[in-house]
C-alpha cells in the first residue's frame, strides 16, 4: 500500500537497450510495451489510482518516419491486444496529447477504448502520446481565449488541460539514466518528487518500482512550506 495518488513514468532507454542486445529499435520499443503489460498488475496491487506513461512525445515526431510509423503502429497493436484484459481488470483508459495528428482510424480506436472503459474504477491508465506539456498548456490557453475569458486563473488552466481530472503528480520516475523531464507534465508535476534510474525501461521490474516508492516514502514533501 502506498500514499501515492499519481505515478508518472518516462519510459526511457528502449532504443539503447536494443543496441546493447544487438536488436533493432523496433524490437526495443516492443520490449518496452511488453514491460507495461508485465508491470501493470503490480501498479494495481499497489493501489495507485492514477498512472501516466510517457509513450510518445510531441518532439518524437522529428524522428525517422520508420520509427514514428512503428511507434504509432505499436499503440494500435497494444490497444487491440490488451483492451479486453485492461477492461476486465477494471482499468480506465485515458489518452492525452495532440491526437488530431494521428490517422483517423487510430483516433477512432482510442475513442473506443476510452468509451469502453469509462466506468472502470480500479486504476486510471493515462497514455501520453503525441504529447508535450508546453503544447498542452498552449492548447489550454487557446481554449480559454476561445471562450472569451479576460482574466485567467490557475483553475481555468487546470480545467482546460487534456485531462482536467488528472491529480498532481506525486512521484515521477524516469528510467534510462537521463536526468531531465523532457516536456512531460510540467503543470501537473510542479511539486512532484523525481526519481531517476540507470536501468533501461525494458530491464525495469517490480523491485525497481518498489525501490522508487520506498525512496519516495522517505522524503518530506513541504510544497514550499516549512
Swiss-Prot record:
<feature type="binding site">
    <location>
        <begin position="180"/>
        <end position="182"/>
    </location>
    <ligand>
        <name>substrate</name>
    </ligand>
</feature>
<feature type="active site" description="Proton acceptor">
    <location>
        <position position="60"/>
    </location>
</feature>
<keyword id="KW-0479">Metal-binding</keyword>
<keyword id="KW-0460">Magnesium</keyword>
<keyword id="KW-0808">Transferase</keyword>
<dbReference type="GO" id="GO:0016094">
    <property type="term" value="P:polyprenol biosynthetic process"/>
</dbReference>
<dbReference type="Pfam" id="PF01255">
    <property type="entry name" value="Prenyltransf"/>
</dbReference>
<dbReference type="InterPro" id="IPR001441">
    <property type="entry name" value="UPP_synth-like"/>
</dbReference>
<feature type="binding site">
    <location>
        <position position="12"/>
    </location>
    <ligand>
        <name>Mg(2+)</name>
    </ligand>
</feature>
<protein>
    <recommendedName>
        <fullName>Isoprenyl transferase</fullName>
        <ecNumber>2.5.1.-</ecNumber>
    </recommendedName>
</protein>
<feature type="binding site">
    <location>
        <position position="25"/>
    </location>
    <ligand>
        <name>substrate</name>
    </ligand>
</feature>
<comment type="function">
    <text>Catalyzes the condensation of isopentenyl diphosphate (IPP) with allylic pyrophosphates generating different type of terpenoids.</text>
</comment>
<comment type="subunit">
    <text>Homodimer.</text>
</comment>
<feature type="binding site">
    <location>
        <begin position="13"/>
        <end position="16"/>
    </location>
    <ligand>
        <name>substrate</name>
    </ligand>
</feature>
<dbReference type="GO" id="GO:0045547">
    <property type="term" value="F:ditrans,polycis-polyprenyl diphosphate synthase [(2E,6E)-farnesyl diphosphate specific] activity"/>
</dbReference>
<feature type="binding site">
    <location>
        <begin position="57"/>
        <end position="59"/>
    </location>
    <ligand>
        <name>substrate</name>
    </ligand>
</feature>
<dbReference type="InterPro" id="IPR036424">
    <property type="entry name" value="UPP_synth-like_sf"/>
</dbReference>
<feature type="binding site">
    <location>
        <position position="63"/>
    </location>
    <ligand>
        <name>substrate</name>
    </ligand>
</feature>
<comment type="similarity">
    <text>Belongs to the UPP synthase family.</text>
</comment>
<feature type="binding site">
    <location>
        <position position="61"/>
    </location>
    <ligand>
        <name>substrate</name>
    </ligand>
</feature>
<feature type="binding site">
    <location>
        <position position="174"/>
    </location>
    <ligand>
        <name>substrate</name>
    </ligand>
</feature>
<dbReference type="InterPro" id="IPR018520">
    <property type="entry name" value="UPP_synth-like_CS"/>
</dbReference>
<dbReference type="GO" id="GO:0000287">
    <property type="term" value="F:magnesium ion binding"/>
</dbReference>
<feature type="binding site">
    <location>
        <position position="193"/>
    </location>
    <ligand>
        <name>Mg(2+)</name>
    </ligand>
</feature>
<feature type="binding site">
    <location>
        <position position="29"/>
    </location>
    <ligand>
        <name>substrate</name>
    </ligand>
</feature>
<feature type="binding site">
    <location>
        <position position="17"/>
    </location>
    <ligand>
        <name>substrate</name>
    </ligand>
</feature>
<feature type="active site">
    <location>
        <position position="12"/>
    </location>
</feature>
Amino acid at each position: 500500500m502506498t500514499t501515492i495518488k499519481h505515478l508518472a513514468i518516462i519510459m526511457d532507454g528502449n532504443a539503447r537497450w536494443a543496441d546493447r542486445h544487438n536488436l533493432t529499435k523496433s524490437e526495443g520499443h516492443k520490449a518496452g510495451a511488453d514491460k507495461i503489460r508485465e508491470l501493470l498488475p503490480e501498479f494495481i496491487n499497489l493501489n495507485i489510482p492514477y498512472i501516466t506513461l510517457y509513450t510518445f512525445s510531441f518532439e518524437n515526431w522529428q524522428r525517422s518516419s520508420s520509427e514514428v510509423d512503428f511507434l504509432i503502429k505499436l499503440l494500435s497493436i497494444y490497444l487491440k491486444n490488451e483492451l479486453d484484459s485492461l477492461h476486465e481488470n477494471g482499468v480506465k483508459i485515458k489518452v492525452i496529447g495532440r491526437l488530431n495528428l494521428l490517422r483517423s482510424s487510430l483516433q477512432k480506436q482510442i475513442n473506443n477504448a476510452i468509451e469502453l472503459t469509462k466506468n472502470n474504477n480500479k486504476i486510471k491508465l493515462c497514455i501520453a502520446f503525441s504529447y508535450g506539456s508546453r503544447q498542452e498548456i498552449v492548447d489550454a490557453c487557446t481554449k480559454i481565449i476561445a471562450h472569451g475569458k479576460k482574466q485567467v486563473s490557475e483553475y481555468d488552466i487546470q480545467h482546460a488541460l487534456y485531462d482536467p481530472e488528472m491529480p498532481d503528480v506525486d512521484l515521477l520516475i524516469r528510467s534510462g539514466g537521463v536526468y531531465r523531464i523532457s516536456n512531460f507534465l510540467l503543470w501537473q508535476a510542479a511539486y512532484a518528487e523525481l526519481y531517476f534510474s540507470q536501468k533501461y525501461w525494458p530491464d525495469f521490474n517490480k523491485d525497481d518500482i518498489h525501490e522508487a516508492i520506498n525512496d519516495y516514502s522517505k522524503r518530506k514533501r513541504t510544497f514550499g512550506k516549512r
